[in-house]
Amino acid sequence: MSDEKICVGAIAGAYGVRGELRIKSFCATAEDIETYSPLTSEDGQRHFHLALVRPIKGGFVARIAEVSSKEEADALKGVQLFALRDQLPSLPDDEYYYTDLIGLQVLDTGGELLGSVKTVADHGAGDILEVQRPGTSETILLPFTRAVVPTVDLLAGKLIADPPEGAL
């Protein structure tokens, strides 16, 4: 069993006065966050038994067994929620968890090093890779599409990119 943790959501704050919380889910099917319970904090010191109550704009109202007041709920604002990788579903060959992409070397189609993946962001229309250029603080943004990133090789720790004109 793998001890690797994946961030599946975050606590956005209290909802009401009875200890309910606003939860943001980062799961492909947002409701699935409940099935990975108990979730942990990033350091693994806190465990949360999550039960979704109802959907709201931008997430869910949830109850956590360990939280019974607004003050306790407020204290958890910003806590990221993690599940063990083994709890998550296997992905098809052409899909990746963001955490697997971060740190990969990015090469252009000619084999030149463009940098490494710093972050992956979902901007609604699609995922964007932020690539840290080597030896500088400069970053470039690349759409994470098959046209721009035709090859991802997790075992080799790299991906091949064909940046759009003007991206560099």
Swiss-Prot record:
GO terms for molecular function: ribosome binding. The keyword Chaperone applies. Its main location: cytoplasm. Keywords: Chaperone, Cytoplasm, Ribosome biogenesis, rRNA processing. Pfam families: PRC_RimM (PF24986), RimM (PF01782). It comes from the Bacteria. GO terms for biological process: ribosomal small subunit biogenesis; rRNA processing. It is found in: Cytoplasm. Residues 93-167 form the PRC barrel domain. One of its GO terms (cellular component) is ribosome. PANTHER family: RIBOSOME MATURATION FACTOR RIMM. The PRC barrel domain binds ribosomal protein uS19. An accessory protein needed during the final step in the assembly of 30S ribosomal subunit, possibly for assembly of the head region. Essential for efficient processing of 16S rRNA. May be needed both before and after RbfA during the maturation of 16S rRNA. It has affinity for free ribosomal 30S subunits but not for 70S ribosomes. HAMAP family: Ribosome_mat_RimM. Binds ribosomal protein uS19. This is Ribosome maturation factor RimM. It comes from Roseobacter denitrificans (strain ATCC 33942 / OCh 114).
